[in-house]
């Protein structure tokens, strides 16, 4: 049997987005024991605003919602440099390949069909958060800025890294090149 994933999610916050109050109540209660904070949004517009204001560590969202659906939410988050690093898991009753492909094309990190088990959702969440932490540690320990084509996760990430690399290359000889300058 594979080793159990023991990644601790208790220091993290999660944003749950769904227009079904019964499901959000269930998820808030179920996920509350695993997370420091569980925030609820009833549609993509509210979720995008909460994400920009509070930057949750991970987002779990329904696809079919009023005002802004889950695909549009993914796209909005992944195009915003300030929050594009936040993993998004889509939950939906739509299990056809076209729906899944649309989710991934718009930036979803994972796609889970309803009905689902909390244990399955938690494993996906743990894996995504653990991967993010591993990437952070790798770059903090090495001090290297990754080349965009090696480890880009979104278009916004790639744009940021290209701009950062260009600034560093253009000012490499400058005595003013430091963190404040960048």
List where the protein language model places each region.
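Active-site beta3 strand of CheY-like receiver
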Residues: 54-60
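Charged docking surfaces used in two-component/phosphorelay signaling
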Residues: 25-33
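C-terminal output helix
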Residues: 116-125, 137
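Receiver (REC) domain active-site loop signature in two-component systems and cognate sites
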Residues: 65
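Short hydrophobic/Thr-rich beta-strand motif most characteristic of the beta2 strand and flanking loop
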Residues: 35-42, 50
């Amino acid at each position: 049997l594979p080793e159990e994933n023991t990644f601790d999610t208790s220091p993290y916050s999660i944003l749950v987005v769904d227009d079904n109050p019964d499901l959000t109540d269930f998820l808030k209660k179920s996920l509350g024991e695993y997370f420091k904070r569980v925030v609820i949004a009833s549609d993509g517009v509210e979720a995008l605003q909460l994400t920009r204001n509070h930057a949750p560590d991970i987002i779990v969202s329904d696809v079919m919602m009023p005002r802004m659906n889950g695909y549009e939410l993914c796209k909005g988050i992944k195009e915003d440099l300030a929050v594009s690093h936040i993993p998004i898991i889509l939950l939906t009753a739509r299990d056809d390949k076209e729906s899944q492909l649309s989710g991934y094309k718009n930036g979803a990190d994972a796609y889970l069909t309803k009905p689902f088990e909390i244990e399955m959702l938690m494993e996906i969440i743990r894996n995504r958060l653990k991967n993010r932490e591993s990437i952070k540690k790798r770059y903090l320990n090495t001090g290297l800025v990754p080349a965009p084509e090696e480890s880009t996760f979104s278009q916004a990430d790639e744009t940021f890294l290209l701009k950062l690399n260009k600034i560093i290359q253009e000012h490499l000889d400058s005595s003013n090149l430091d963190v404040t300058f960048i």
